[in-house]
C-alpha cells in the first residue's frame, strides 16, 4: 500500500522539516518531499502537527509490559515486548538475556532464531549479557553462574552469530580473548560488568570490542587522577556506549559530561525490565530467580541492588532534553541513528530517508506517542 504522512514536523537524519510529507510504499520510505508536491489522490494520514521521526532502537531491553525474556523465554514474550515498545515509539530492540546456565542461553538463541524467521526489523537479534563477567561488578546477575566460556560454548555462539547481535563480556574475563572470533562471526563485543583497570579495558577495545554496556553502571570508575578504570577507557576510546537516562542509574550531570566527550557514540538505552510499560499495580516480579521490587520508578532486589530500569525510550528522550539539556533533534539521534550505526544497520534503519525501512514514531510536543509505523504499516496508539 502507498500513502503519505502529512502535517508533521519531520526529524530526518540531520534536518528538521516542516510542510514536507513522507511517502511510504510497501515497507519502504519512497520519498520525503514538499507536501505541496504530493500527487493527487494519494492516501494521506494527517499527523496534526506532531513530530515524526525514525522509530527508536533500544540496544538493551531485558523485558517490559510485565514480562522478562530470561524468565519467560519464548517467541510470545518477544512479541509482547515489541507491542509494549510501540506504545513508546520504540520500533526495534535487542532482547537482552543475562547470566544463566549454558542450556538456557542455547534456548534463548533458538527462540531468537524462531522469532527472526517470523518477524523482521523489530527484535534485531540477541544481546547476551553475561555470564562472562566480573564477580565484583555482577550487579543483579547471579554469581554462581558467572564463569569463563568453554570451547564448546564459544563454538556454539560463533555458529549462531547470525542471530546474536551483541555480547557483553568483562574486559578481565579470559573470554575476552575470543573477541576476534566473535567479531568474525558477526557478533559485536561490548565491555561491561567489568572491574578492569584502564589498561586492561583498553586492551579489550584493541582486541575488537566496539561497545560498552551501560556506561558508569557495573564498571570500575575513574577513582583518582591515576586510576581511570573502565569508565576512563570508554571515554578515551572511539567506541560506542549505551547510557541509561532515568536519573536513577547515574546522575544527569554525568550524562552531560559523557555527551560532550562521546558525541555521536553515545546511545540511549533503557536496560528496562518487566516494570516498563506495565500496569501501575505491578509491585514486584521475578527476574532470574530473584524477587524484584518496584517503587517510585526504581527496581531493586532484596539487597537494594539496582536490578534494571522501568523507563521507556520516549521517557529517556524527554529526560535527556529536560534534565541534560540535549537538543531534541540530538536526543532523537541518540535513540535511533546512533544505535543503528553501533550495530551496523544504519543502511536500512535509524533515520527518515528515501529507500530505508519505514519504521517510524509519531509523538506530541509533550512526548506522548500517538502512533508508529513498522515495516510500512501504520498503527495508532
Swiss-Prot record:
Residues annotated as the enzyme's active site: 271 (proton donor/acceptor)
SUPFAM superfamilies reported for this sequence: Composite domain of metallo-dependent hydrolases, Metallo-dependent hydrolases
Protein name per Swiss-Prot or TrEMBL: N-acetylglucosamine-6-phosphate deacetylase
Subunit and partners: Homotetramer.
Pfam families: Amidohydro_1 (PF01979)
CDD domains: NagA (cd00854)
Keywords, ordered alphabetically: Carbohydrate metabolism, Hydrolase, Metal-binding
Cofactor(s) of this protein: a divalent metal cation
Residues that coordinate or bind substrate: 140-141, 217-218, 226, 246-249, 306-308
Enzyme Commission number: 3.5.1.25
GO molecular function: metal ion binding; N-acetylglucosamine-6-phosphate deacetylase activity
Co-factor note (free text): Binds 1 divalent metal cation per subunit.
